[in-house]
Amino acid sequence: MEALVYTFLLVGTLGIIFFAIFFREPPKITSNKK
């Protein structure tokens, strides 16, 4: 059961970070890099 909690925490943290980056910079990264 501990593994489930750790996985949930990891996914939650990654999701929050991804959301923060996505909202901070619009999806123009591919356009900017090319």
Curated annotation (Swiss-Prot):
Membrane protein topology class: Single-pass membrane protein
Compartment annotation: Plastid, Chloroplast thylakoid membrane
GO biological process, one term: photosynthesis
Top-rank lineage group of the source organism: Eukaryota
GO cellular component, one term: chloroplast thylakoid membrane
Chief localisation class: plastid
One Pfam family, short name: PsbT
Entry keyword Coiled coil: no
Transmembrane segments: 3-23
InterPro entries: PSII_PsbT (IPR001743), PSII_PsbT_sf (IPR037268)
Keyword terms, alphabetized: Chloroplast, Membrane, Photosynthesis, Photosystem II, Plastid, Thylakoid, Transmembrane, Transmembrane helix
PANTHER family cross-referenced by the UniProt entry: PHOTOSYSTEM II REACTION CENTER PROTEIN T, PTHR36411
Family in the record: Belongs to the PsbT family.
Family annotation (HAMAP family): PSII_PsbT
Oligomer status and interactors: PSII is composed of 1 copy each of membrane proteins PsbA, PsbB, PsbC, PsbD, PsbE, PsbF, PsbH, PsbI, PsbJ, PsbK, PsbL, PsbM, PsbT, PsbY, PsbZ, Psb30/Ycf12, at least 3 peripheral proteins of the oxygen-evolving complex and a large number of cofactors. It forms dimeric complexes.
Job description of the protein: Found at the monomer-monomer interface of the photosystem II (PS II) dimer, plays a role in assembly and dimerization of PSII. PSII is a light-driven water plastoquinone oxidoreductase, using light energy to abstract electrons from H(2)O, generating a proton gradient subsequently used for ATP formation.
Protein name: Photosystem II reaction center protein T
Species whose genome carries this gene: Klebsormidium bilatum (Filamentous green alga)
Highest classification ranks of the organism: Eukaryota, Viridiplantae, Streptophyta, Klebsormidiophyceae, Klebsormidiales
